[in-house]
From Swiss-Prot:
<dbReference type="InterPro" id="IPR004046">
    <property type="entry name" value="GST_C"/>
</dbReference>
<dbReference type="InterPro" id="IPR004045">
    <property type="entry name" value="Glutathione_S-Trfase_N"/>
</dbReference>
<dbReference type="GO" id="GO:0005212">
    <property type="term" value="F:structural constituent of eye lens"/>
</dbReference>
<feature type="domain" description="GST N-terminal">
    <location>
        <begin position="2"/>
        <end position="80"/>
    </location>
</feature>
<dbReference type="Pfam" id="PF14497">
    <property type="entry name" value="GST_C_3"/>
</dbReference>
<dbReference type="GO" id="GO:0004364">
    <property type="term" value="F:glutathione transferase activity"/>
</dbReference>
<dbReference type="Pfam" id="PF02798">
    <property type="entry name" value="GST_N"/>
</dbReference>
<feature type="domain" description="GST C-terminal">
    <location>
        <begin position="82"/>
        <end position="215"/>
    </location>
</feature>
<dbReference type="InterPro" id="IPR036282">
    <property type="entry name" value="Glutathione-S-Trfase_C_sf"/>
</dbReference>
<protein>
    <recommendedName>
        <fullName>S-crystallin 2</fullName>
    </recommendedName>
</protein>
<keyword id="KW-0273">Eye lens protein</keyword>
<dbReference type="InterPro" id="IPR003083">
    <property type="entry name" value="S-crystallin"/>
</dbReference>
<dbReference type="InterPro" id="IPR010987">
    <property type="entry name" value="Glutathione-S-Trfase_C-like"/>
</dbReference>
<dbReference type="InterPro" id="IPR050213">
    <property type="entry name" value="GST_superfamily"/>
</dbReference>
<comment type="function">
    <text>S-crystallins are structural components of squids and octopi eye lens. Contains relatively little GST activity (1/1000 of that of mammalian GST enzyme).</text>
</comment>
<dbReference type="InterPro" id="IPR036249">
    <property type="entry name" value="Thioredoxin-like_sf"/>
</dbReference>
<comment type="similarity">
    <text>Belongs to the GST superfamily.</text>
</comment>
Amino acid sequence: MPSYTLHYFNHRGRAEICRMLFAAAGVQYNDRRVDCSEWTGMRNQMPCSMMPMLEIDNRHQIPQSMAIARYLAREFGFHGRNNLDMARVDFISDCFYDILDDYLRMYHDKDGRMMFQRSYDNGSSSERRMRFQETCRRILPFMERTLEMRNGGNQFFMGDQMTMADLMCYCALENPLTDDTSMLSSYPKLQALRNRVMSHMKMSPYLKSRSSTDF
């Protein structure tokens, strides 16, 4: 088994999908949580000067959260059984990532840096919030219909197999649902899916024991 180190801030953010995949697979890894005060000094050491970054065997470095997530999903068996399955898992995951990305961008400063503060006002929060809301209006009905296509939406996006797509549904909507608990009231299948992920035998212990952070 390779050794893994996941580098990210002490927040869920764009790395949580990767942490959830490790938890679902039961694979040990070094969860390196970088303090924001450390970041300036180490930024240029990171590929693309960004995190998250996955380090494998202290030799290989993979940047970009969804590239990391896809790699782990393939390695651990959470990316579908064939190429068509993988394409379905990918487009579902990317749809939820669009929601996550637009949400987090409401808390970026003018230089594009994540502020990790709910009270932060970047001066264009209204415009960015409208974009986030439009993304949700565009994507959530489609995701509800997509889920219903397999077993009436009563299991997972791929039927009886939990994949990265289901984990993305959970983690991408965590903060938005904190802001608006009725967000999924028109999407009961998605709400039930998130409950299934939360009660999964591998996910439940992880979700209960992980660090509590704002983002």
